[in-house]
Amino acid sequence: MENTTRTWVFPKLDTRQFVLLAMLMALHMVLSRLTVGTNVLQVSFAFVTMSLIAKWYGPLWSMLIAAILDVIGATIINPGAFFVGFTFTAMISALIYSLAYFKHDKTSWWRVSVAVGLVLLIANIGLNSIWLVMMYHTAHDWPSFLAFITPRVIKNLIMFPIQVGISYFLLNNQVISHTTKKIFS
């Protein structure tokens, strides 16, 4: 029996993989800026690019890229809005997507639903709400916290089937499968 030790290292990227990653990063920056809503409640489709990065590059690359994209977005594109908690949230979301999608040729409805549900619950409703309360001091007692979080829960309940549908279609698309075979094989 062969002794195989799984270590957490950054896999080397060839030129095509690196260029694809750069293109996905650029697309992510565009999609993350095309939001609807307020500072407290926003709808964005940046999860699309992060899902692809997680599927193709794995947990370490996707977490690093999520952190880089968050820092670039908060300091260069939208100066003055940086908070390290949101960077941590982006990394946790990337990790969840990677654990669900990386090294899976076909991604089931169940796997996509669990991944999206965990990201929406842990990252969007949980961590991001905590960071916003810390930043804006909006909830000083339980009733004000419930008033603050209720629209966030409703927004994420609405976004859940939308994100699951888009993610499932995207991750199981023939073009994506062909790209995976061509660039990552």
Curated annotation (Swiss-Prot):
It is found in: Cell membrane. InterPro entries: ECF_S_folate_fam (IPR030949), ECF_trnsprt_substrate-spec (IPR024529). Gene3D superfamilies: 1.10.1760.20. Pfam families: ECF_trnsprt (PF12822). It is a multi-pass membrane protein. The chain crosses the membrane at residues 34-54, 64-84, 114-134, 157-177. Keywords: Cell membrane, Folate-binding, Membrane, Transmembrane, Transmembrane helix, Transport. GO terms for cellular component: plasma membrane. GO terms for molecular function: folic acid binding; transmembrane transporter activity. The keyword Plastid does not apply. NCBIfam families: ECF_S_folT_fam (TIGR04518). Folate-binding protein that interacts with the energy-coupling factor (ECF) ABC-transporter complex. Unlike classic ABC transporters this ECF transporter provides the energy necessary to transport a number of different substrates. The substrates themselves are bound by transmembrane, not extracytoplasmic soluble proteins. Upon coexpression with EcfA1A2T in E.coli allows 5-formyltetrahydrofolate uptake; uptake requires both FolT and EcfA1A2T. In E.coli forms a stable energy-coupling factor (ECF) transporter complex probably composed of a membrane-embedded substrate-binding protein (S component), two ATP-binding proteins (A components) and a transmembrane protein (T component). This is Folate transporter FolT. The lineage of its organism: Bacteria, Bacillati, Bacillota, Bacilli, Lactobacillales. The gene is folT.
